[in-house]
């Protein structure tokens, strides 16, 4: 049996997406494409090809893809979570991103789809819920 390489796509091509891409690149990993209808006319964003809007995902087997949500978080704005839930309901899986420059205790619990960005410090007993963003430089002390 031949093993198919899983492709990794990031949803969104804006500012938050670029920060997450940088964190991922520092870990030595590769993102294969960007999914964002607003950037379809661009060939690439920070050197990563734009493959189209959500419909571009339909050309791949769900089992052959993993996603990163690169849509940023704004107070009172639910767009990021709506996108994730819509794609999860279709069967897609989201990866967790932890920047190599973050300090994360071995006793931290991190759920699926979480993003811990550069300069963060997560101490003993911290729990980060699904799809949360721990933004650049955040410090969460014990038992948060």
Which residue stretches match the model-derived regions?
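Glycine/small-residue-rich loop that forms an oxyanion/phosphate-binding "nest" at active or ligand-binding sites
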Residues: 69-97
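Structural signal for interior beta-strand "rungs" in well-ordered beta-sheet cores
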Residues: 96-144
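Short amphipathic alpha-helical segments
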Residues: 21-24, 79-83, 128
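A solvent-exposed beta-alpha-beta segment
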Residues: 2-70
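Short alpha-helical
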Residues: 15-16, 75-78, 109
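Glycine-rich hexapeptide-repeat left-handed beta-helix
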Residues: 5, 68-71, 76, 136, ...
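Glycine-rich nucleotide phosphate-binding loop and flanking beta-alpha elements
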Residues: 17, 41, 75, 122, ...
């Amino acid at each position: 049996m031949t093993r198919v390489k899983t492709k990794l796509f990031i949803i969104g091509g804006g500012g938050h997406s670029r920060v997450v891409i940088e964190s991922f690149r520092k870990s030595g990993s590769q993102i294969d494409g960007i999914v964002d209808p607003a950037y379809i006319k661009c060939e690439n964003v920070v050197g990563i090809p734009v493959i189209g809007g959500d419909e571009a995902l339909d050309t791949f087997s769900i089992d052959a893809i993993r996603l990163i949500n690169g849509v940023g978080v704004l107070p009172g704005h639910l767009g990021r979570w709506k996108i994730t839930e819509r794609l999860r309901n279709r069967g897609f899986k989201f990866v967790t991103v932890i920047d190599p420059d973050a300090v994360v205790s071995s006793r931290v619990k991190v759920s699926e789809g979480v993003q811990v960005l550069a300069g963060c410090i997560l101490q003993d007993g911290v729990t980060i819920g699904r799809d949360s963003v721990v933004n650049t430089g955040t410090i969460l002390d014990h038992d948060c």
